[in-house]
Amino acid sequence: MDLVKSVAKTLLLYFLLQYIAFFIFFRFWLLPNNYLVIFTLVQLFFYCIIFFFLVKNKNLFYNTLSGEKETKVNIPNKITLLRITMLPLLVFLTFVSQKHMEKTSHTGRVILTIAFAMTFATDAFDGRMARIKKQETYMGKILDSASDYLLLGIITIAFFYFKLIKPWLFLVIIIRLFLNALVMLILSLVQKKIHPQTTVLGKIAIAVIMVLLVLEAAKIPVLLPWIRLAEGAAAFLIGISIIDKIVYLKRGLKSALPMDFHN
């Protein structure tokens, strides 16, 4: 029960902070009233899904080193949850900054860039903090992996819709994200358990995509040549990581299958 209360308090705090932030933007930019209504409904729906998922799987909140059950949401997991719950706000900020450029102008792009940069930056802290403090939980690993691909997948689609990224780059990123989800699904079915693991190249690919999306959101004129260069470098690294993920799948299947199937 203490864990459920901790989850509820954490999500309620994030909900209020994000709602207040959007309300400030809503009033400052004089947006249509239906935007606030839609954002509120989307937030409530999204948060309800997260809450029920966490409560239903509360038994996964255990320390992977000691096996001890968690009685509250630790700091690393709170950081991960913050990253996940930022999704609706990021999507709405992207929509507003592109759909109402005459109202948001330069300010909207700056806010959007800062929001993306701060959200993606949390990915560098939660896992590291969990390892240093020896607070790694099984649920934390699942959330960390899911947050990256959920955020990047939906944000990439939003960026493509508003022509913030090129079609070829969109395809490269989506193929990489889809392949990772497919690999996790296959290994989970074969191994009868979710193993949210990643490779070094996988981590690099995710970091590169995050940095690239921040640059694409900023679209600073003086940096445009460098952004084009970054797009090419990102596509190359993502392509290499796709091959790496296929190799990872092959190894995972080989270790999961009986010895008779290895030959």
Residue ranges of each PLM-predicted region?
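A feature for the membrane-embedded catalytic helix bundles of lipid/isoprenoid biosynthetic enzymes
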Residues: 1-73, 77, 91, 113, ...
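Hydrophobic alpha-helical segments and helix pairs
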Residues: 68-115
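Residue-level signature of catalytic and energy-coupling elements of molecular machines
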Residues: 83, 123, 144, 204
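Short active-site segment of divalent metal-dependent hydrolases/proteases
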Residues: 86, 126, 147-151
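Membrane-interface starts of transmembrane alpha-helices
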Residues: 104-111, 140, 223-226
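Membrane-cytosol interface at the C-terminal ends of specific transmembrane alpha-helices
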Residues: 116-120, 124-128, 141
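Membrane-interface helix/loop boundary segments of multi-pass membrane proteins
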Residues: 127-135
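Short hydrophobic alpha-helical segments within the ABC transporter permease transmembrane module
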Residues: 134, 142-146
